Amino acid sequence: MSSIKLIVGLANPGAEYAQTRHNAGAWYVDLLALRHNQQLKEESKFFGYTARLNLAGQDVRLLVPSTFMNLSGKAVAAMAGFYRILPEEILVAHDELDIPPGVAKLKLGGGNGGHNGLKDIQSKLGNNPNFYRLRIGIGHPGDKSKVTGFVLGNPPASEQTLIDDAIDESIRCTEVLLKEDITKAMNRLHSFKAGAQ
């Protein structure tokens, strides 16, 4: 059984970014709240939108920072500090260029893969990388110079469906993570591929 007390969905704020690939982490948290009949509400002291729910018998707080992506650590550190939540009790959901749409991966600790949101969170948690990451695949444009435009672009409908399916399965696997352990959650999530029969 894994103890997760805070689930964070990374995003850029504002309507113009809401449907961009970079906001995949927030899509996951929004759907998780919706599934539990909760609505994220703005809470200025945590620099973001928050909710609280009972997930697999555990008291879990949700957070979507309202800062820009590269300042996400400010919101995460504020909430973790206030509720005395340790890095290893935090799950951060984010978009992942190195994974195709329709696939998501779960891991504990590791590098930031050049993701500015993860970089800032790790820095604000005292350079402790030992938090859970839910990596939601968005695919790669194939050329490094196109990455910024790609992550800040909206996926076509076919890709959006695949990403949504992976998020849906990720929510089921989050419950497995909380009820059982990371190995079982990873085994299930890593064998899932949206669109595969």
UniProtKB/Swiss-Prot annotation:
SUPFAM superfamilies: Peptidyl-tRNA hydrolase-like (SSF53178). Hydrolyzes ribosome-free peptidyl-tRNAs (with 1 or more amino acids incorporated), which drop off the ribosome during protein synthesis, or as a result of ribosome stalling. Catalyzes the release of premature peptidyl moieties from peptidyl-tRNA molecules trapped in stalled 50S ribosomal subunits, and thus maintains levels of free tRNAs and 50S ribosomes. Belongs to the PTH family. The keyword tRNA-binding applies. Its EC number is 3.1.1.29. The record marks 12 as: Discriminates between blocked and unblocked aminoacyl-tRNA. One of its GO terms (cellular component) is cytoplasm. InterPro entries: Pept_tRNA_hydro, Pept_tRNA_hydro_CS, Pept_tRNA_hydro_sf. It is found in: Cytoplasm. Pfam families: Pept_tRNA_hydro. Keywords: Cytoplasm, Hydrolase, RNA-binding, tRNA-binding. Its main location: cytoplasm. This is Peptidyl-tRNA hydrolase. TRNA binds at residues 17, 68, 70, 116. CDD domains: PTH (cd00462). Monomer. The active site is at residue 22. One of its GO terms (molecular function) is tRNA binding. It comes from Yersinia enterocolitica serotype O:8 / biotype 1B (strain NCTC 13174 / 8081). The record marks 95 as: Stabilizes the basic form of H active site to accept a proton. It catalyses: an N-acyl-L-alpha-aminoacyl-tRNA + H2O = an N-acyl-L-amino acid + a tRNA + H(+). It is an enzyme of class 3 (hydrolase).
